Amino acid sequence: MKKTCKTLLLSLLVLVFACAAAHCEETASVYDDISMTELLPELVARLDEPLLTEDGYYDFGGALVAAYESGRLKGKILAFDDIAAVAAPSQADFTQAHSLRQGASIESVEELMGGPGREIAMLRLSDGENAGSRRVLAWANEAGDAMEALFELDDGQWVLFAAVRIPAAAH
């Protein structure tokens, strides 16, 4: 299961960087306005007709949505050009973030990072042992380094699975 979650996080990172959004604030607003409890037809009626990407995602102006055949949402992803433009500010450096281990609570991660992260992805998986909800949160420090962490909802607690460094030169 750990390998699947890390693979999922890395896949999300590739997808997010591959999908560029021109207006970060507008895109973030649309992303925040999408509820995982909505059905795809409800979103289309409320937010306008999305573009369908090659990967089967529905693009609502930079907020990407994946849905099951039933129309139930299985994920949403915030697309951006520069992660530092959308990530929450942090005083932490990667060395500190790297010290986090699997099992860290979201509260301890936020304390280390200096505040809540910016959600850039939410997934709801329904396949066997991998079933559950996952969130990817992002922070960026003054040096321009961006850090992301994947959390899984487990018994009411968010659990850290991975922290990934995105050097300033990459964004």
List each model region and its residues:
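Sec-dependent signal peptide cleavage junction
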Residues: 19-26
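Bacterial N-terminal signal peptides
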Residues: 10-18
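Intrinsically disordered, low-complexity Ser/Thr-rich linker and spacer segments
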Residues: 79-95
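Bacterial N-terminal signal peptides that target proteins for export
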Residues: 1-9
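Second-shell loop/turn segments in exported
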Residues: 28-33, 92-100, 136-138
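A cross-family detector of function-defining hotspots
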Residues: 36-82, 102-171
